[in-house]
C-alpha cells in the first residue's frame, strides 16, 4: 500500500487544540452510548429479568455467531428528542452474522 504524505503538522497548536476538542466529543459519545446500552433503567431491567426474560442485548448476543461483530445502526435514535429517556428509541437494529450469514437484526427493547 502506498503512503500518502501530508503537510499537516501534528505538533502545531491548532492541530493539538483540534485533537483535544475532538477527544472531548469522543468521550461524550462513549459516555452517552454506555448509558444507552444499559437499556431502560435498573427497575425496568430487573422487572424484565424477574419474569425470566433475557434483556434485549442478551438476546442479540445469543443470536450472533460467537465472536462475530455486531454493527449497531440506530443506538442514538430518539436521543434527546423527548422529555423522558427512550434509549435507542426502544429498538436495537444492526448487522451481524448468524449461522455464517450476514443478517439485519431487529430486537424490540421493552425495558
Regions found by a protein language model. Give the residues of each.
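Terminal-region recognition feature
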Residues: 1-111
Amino acid at each position: 500500500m502506498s503512503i500518502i504524505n501530508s503537510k499537516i503538522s501534528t505538533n502545531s497548536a491548532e492541530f493539538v487544540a483540534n485533537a483535544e476538542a475532538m477527544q472531548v466529543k469522543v468521550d461524550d459519545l462513549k459516555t452517552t452510548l454506555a448509558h444507552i446500552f444499559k437499556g431502560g433503567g435498573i427497575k425496568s431491567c430487573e422487572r424484565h429479568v424477574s419474569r425470566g426474560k433475557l434483556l434485549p442485548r442478551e438476546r442479540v448476543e445469543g443470536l450472533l455467531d460467537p465472536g462475530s461483530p455486531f454493527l449497531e445502526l440506530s443506538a442514538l435514535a430518539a436521543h434527546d428528542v423527548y422529555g423522558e429517556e427512550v434509549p435507542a428509541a426502544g429498538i436495537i437494529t444492526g448487522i451481524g452474522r448468524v449461522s455464517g450469514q450476514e443478517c439485519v437484526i431487529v430486537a424490540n427493547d421493552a425495558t
